[in-house]
Amino acid sequence: MTSSTEIHTGDIGEALCYYRLLQMGVPCRIVNLGATDILAILDDDVVIRVQVKTAHQTFDPRYKNRSAFYGFNVCRGSKEKRRFLEHEIDVFACVGLEDEAIIFYQAKHLLQKKTHKVKAHLFSDSGVTQDSWSKAIKPLLYT
């Protein structure tokens, strides 16, 4: 069973992602429909299905140089983990809560994984949200 803390964290991540997309001028809506958390509409005819994953910053205690990272669960299910399928989503939004920043990825780059670790310092770049969104959607606009 998913804890209320995990649900709360996920809701905050979705709200932050929605807010950042609107700040960037991207028309979107929170939908929570199947595998899709947010629908973004580009150029009035391209629909982008976004799956939002949210994490808190953590450290790996096994190493002396404990650099902070975010660990994202990029699959579905609270007990039995199942990978998303390519036809279900277009973009993953990995939300780093402490930095209030997002790194977007084309879904196909993370579909074969169950977890995805990102060094926390990558979220501190002021342009990371805009830059990663542009990079993630570019191939979807020209297919």
Where are these regions (language model features)?
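Mixed-charge (Asp/Glu-Lys/Arg
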Residues: 1-34, 40-143
